[in-house]
A protein has these predicted regions:
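Short helix-coil boundary/hinge micro-motifs
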Residues: 1-10, 42-45, 156, 172-186
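Signal for well-folded cores of large energy- and translation-related assemblies
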Residues: 51, 125, 133-137, 152-153, ...
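Extended interfacial segments that mediate partner engagement and assembly in macromolecular machines
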Residues: 86-162, 167-170
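N-terminal cysteine/histidine-rich coordination modules
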Residues: 1-100
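Amphipathic alpha-helical transducer elements in NTP-driven molecular machines
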Residues: 36-43, 76, 142-145, 168-171, ...
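Helix-rich interaction surfaces within compact, conserved domain-sized segments
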Residues: 189-242, 246
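Electropositive, gly/pro-rich neighborhoods at or near active sites that engage anionic ligands
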Residues: 73, 95, 100, 104, ...
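Compact, Lys/Arg-rich rRNA/RNP-binding cores from ribosome-related proteins
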Residues: 50-87, 151-156, 161-171, 175-177, ...
Length: 255
């Protein structure tokens, strides 16, 4: 739901593709989970303000076309967006995005590719998979239902993630263990199936993932929230919540 122009974006995961109403030079920014001040930016489409780390930067190329810069590291000028993909695609199709870009960059020569929404979604997805891989290599991540259950009951799990095709029984069991260990009511549903989680981590049959380092959990949650917010927070959850449990018979042996 659209918020008033001067209201800060809050609530559910923020969508990575909302247009920021400001043009600025890219520069270093603090990482999620630390105590440093994070500047705000304004979405060029909705007019809502939000933390720079939560919005998506569009970098202006030499050809006058914008491209996704989800890590906000590209040099040169940029604009910011904070709407979901459906809103962005509609704005792009109807010319509203082009008008917003023209106002932000003060030039009518700026354009956006027709598949900008798809490009942003791909970039956000890649950012999540890369982050999971990095945390796994750093030893900050567990997979395997039995390992996760034990760590969760001891209070060592700071973020719990289920693949979209995880069985209902397995999810419920780990959610309960996490609650008993002082965690949240339930884990987050990953927007894709176990095959993608397994590929990202270089392991077989990864259905559940737990972050056992607080800072690592904050980094993964931030990347995952941005992706889920852009594609829609319920995207990928149908398989995990509707119909009979999926592969619940093997949940106890998930890697």
């Amino acid at each position: 739901m659209r918020k008033p122009p001067n209201e800060r974006l809050t609530g559910q995961p923020r969508t990575p593709a909302e247009a920021g109403g400001q043009v600025e030079e890219a520069g270093p920014q603090p990482s999620p989970g630390n105590d440093k001040h994070i500047p705000e930016r304004k979405c060029i489409l909705s007019g809502a303000h939000g933390a720079r780390d939560d919005l998506i930067r569009l970098a202006l190329g030499p050809d006058g076309q914008v491209a996704p810069d989800v890590r906000a590291k590209a040099p040169g000028r940029g604009a910011w967006i904070g709407v979901d993909r459906a809103t962005l695609d509609t704005a792009n199709e109807k010319g509203k995005l082009k008008g917003a870009l023209a106002r932000s960059f003060k030039s009518g020569a700026v354009s956006a590719p027709a598949d900008l929404g798809a490009q942003i979604e791909t970039a956000l997805r890649r950012a999540v998979l890369d982050r999971l891989g990095l945390e796994a290599r750093a030893g900050n991540l567990l997979s395997g239902a039995e390992k996760i259950e034990g760590a969760a009951r001891k209070g060592d799990v700071h973020l719990l993630i289920h693949a979209s095709d995880a069985g209902a029984d397995g999810r419920s069991k780990l959610d309960q263990a996490w609650r008993m260990g002082g965690g949240e009511p339930q884990g987050l549903v990953f927007p894709e199936e176990r095959a993608i989680l397994s590929l990202a981590l270089g392991r077989q049959n990864v259905v559940h993932v737990a972050l056992i380092d607080r800072a690592a959990a904050a980094r993964v949650r931030h990347a995952l929230d941005r992706w889920r917010a852009f594609i829609g927070p319920n995207e990928g959850q149908i398989a995990a919540t509707a119909g009979p449990p999926v592969a619940s018979a093997v949940d106890g042996y998930e890697g």
